Amino acid sequence: MDIARTGKRLGILTALCLALACACMAGAAQQDPFESLFGHKAFPAGAKDFPRYIEKHWTRVLKAEQDKPCLQRDASCLEAPDAAQWIYLASKAPSMDELTLLRSVNSFFNKFPNSSDMENYGVADHWPTMAEFLQRRSGDCKAYTLSKYFALRAFGVPDDKLRIVMTHQPAYKVNHAVLAVATAKGVFILDDLVRPIDLIRPQETLRSEYIPLFMLNEQGRWTFKPKAELLRAKPARQ
């Protein structure tokens, strides 16, 4: 037996195995936590795949929040007692772990009652700024979701960990907006309809409750290409 040749082959095989293991570990580390949501695979959406009305509303509210952010440390857009609660939350946020922060933000906004866009703004569909929502102290699912998104951004949560998700709820045959947040313990869903109001839930436990339609943040747009008839469902739940 050629010991030298055998040793060389073993060395090559070992190096290949190590390279493959490193590649697998790197791939796992770089995996997009939002690649699949509620059991459905996400696809980057082009202009033809993403609804124009969603893009229009999102572009407007994003610009408004960037030009005049509502929730600063002085809580200038809030009235008592909301301002005091926000200032307290803002002071504690830096020391909170991820899940405690999500529960706190969920609770802060979910304490407000639900109402429709028609009741608040006299139109069928409106994407409010956080200031609009908090001044009225009520809103529909979009209002809660948008406000939670911008609140978490104000607390330093990066955009790539956040997704606004338009979903379909088959049990109610309606569309509904929620916020998905990536953490070290997985992706959690912030919904205005949950009780207790601070409840956050892992996305993988909600496959039967939500069918994702579209997803967006400041940098991207995604579609899940569900059945077309879901897009013709009733208006969003409040």
Q: Model-derived features: where do they sit?
A:
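Bacterial N-terminal signal peptides
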Residues: 13-23
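A structural boundary/capping signal
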Residues: 2, 26-238
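Bacterial N-terminal signal peptides that target proteins for export
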Residues: 2-14
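Compositionally biased, intrinsically disordered low-complexity regions
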Residues: 7, 18, 236-237
